[in-house]
């Protein structure tokens, strides 16, 4: 190895020392202003390969420079998002761990709720979590796979009545919005179907394309839209306040006579309860700013979702609205079994 020139060696030592002092100063500043040192972790409550995972990773890339720390993303799927959310109860409330999830488990998972079921489900966020920011509102989508020989919800009902239990209906898991949609149509339509709960993500779509079941309750997303446009999926209905622009010919479930099943999914970021208010405000501001960026907004709109944003208080209000919708759709939802 060629030895360093003395002058270069001195410069090298000074550069290393300056870098170390800079890091130390950064850590000191983090402690002085109440900001935790170290990377931020975002746990996505769903498997890799889905819309939620893609949006969470795009958001992480925008948050890192705004917060001045690395942002790491990992996946912890299961129980429709409840497993990741439950982990917040065991986490240190320093604002270094966030969970990206739909809000549905906050109403449906008994481990996240406290108090009387009716009171809890109609209220806002449960005490186990602190809302940070709303990220997106995603319409639900009911599709027929290549194995489905009908072309409409009317056909679905007719086939199910002809062959009780013969239609296999997949969702992203028990106690998800898709499961609620299934149950509402099942009860209102007086039919029997076979529920196949997944953990969400790419495997569910792969099996759908392979025709391993006839029906899929999912969310509007870029891949789903691609498969509908190519004819591989038959779009039967959407759950949204009005028809979605990407699928203007597909009716809402309310139009088809299933208003209680006309549900969309709200997704956002959550921190452990007890996270310092100043840290929550900092995180909320960074998320809200990131959602204004063209890259993020474009990715959301391409996926068929609407950006949310706004304050943590506004997100808490959205959670309360979602809980009220679920309470109306399924009065016994808080007693619903969760994986």
Per-region residue spans from a language model:
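An extracytoplasmic/periplasmic, membrane-proximal ligand-sensing/linker region
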Residues: 37-40, 279-339
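Hinge/capping helix and adjacent helix->loop/strand transition within the periplasmic-binding protein
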Residues: 90-96, 110-203, 253, 266-299
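N-terminal secretory signal peptides
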Residues: 1-11, 15-25
């Amino acid at each position: 190895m060629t030895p360093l020139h003395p002058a270069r060696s001195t410069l090298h030592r000074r550069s290393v020392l300056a870098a170390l002092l800079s890091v130390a100063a950064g850590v000191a500043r983090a402690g002085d202003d109440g900001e935790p040192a170290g990377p931020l972790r975002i746990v996505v409550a769903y498997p890799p390969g889905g819309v939620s995972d893609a949006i969470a990773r795009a958001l992480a890339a925008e948050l890192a420079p705004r917060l001045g720390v690395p942002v790491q993303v990992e996946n912890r799927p299961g129980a429709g998002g409840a497993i990741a959310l439950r982990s917040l109860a065991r986490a240190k409330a320093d604002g270094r761990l966030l969970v990206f999830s739909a809000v549905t488990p906050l109403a449906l998972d008994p481990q996240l709720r406290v108090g009387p079921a009716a009171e809890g489900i109609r209220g806002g966020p449960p005490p186990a979590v602190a809302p940070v920011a709303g990220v997106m509102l995603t319409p639900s989508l009911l599709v027929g796979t290549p194995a489905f020989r009908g072309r409409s919800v009317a056909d679905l009902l007719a086939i199910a009545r002809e062959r009780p239990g013969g239609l296999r209906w997949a969702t992203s898991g028990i106690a998800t919005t898709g499961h609620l949609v299934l149950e509402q149509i099942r009860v209102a339509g007086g039919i029997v179907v076979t529920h196949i709960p997944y953990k969400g993500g790419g495997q569910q779509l792969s099996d759908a394309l392979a025709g391993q079941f006839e029906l899929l309750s999912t969310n509007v997303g870029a891949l789903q839209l691609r498969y509908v446009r190519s004819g591989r999926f038959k779009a039967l209905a959407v759950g949204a306040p009005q028809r979605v622009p990407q699928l203007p010919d597909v009716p809402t479930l309310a139009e088809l006579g299933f208003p209680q099943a006309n549900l969309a999914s709200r997704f956002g970021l959550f921190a452990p309860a007890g996270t310092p208010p100043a840290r929550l405000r900092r995180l909320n501001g960074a998320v809200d700013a990131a959602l204004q960026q063209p890259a993020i907004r474009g990715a959301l709109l391409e996926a068929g979702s609407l950006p949310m944003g706004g304050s943590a208080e506004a997100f808490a209000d959205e959670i309360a609205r979602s809980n009220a919708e679920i309470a109306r759709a399924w009065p016994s939802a808080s007693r619903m079994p969760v994986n």
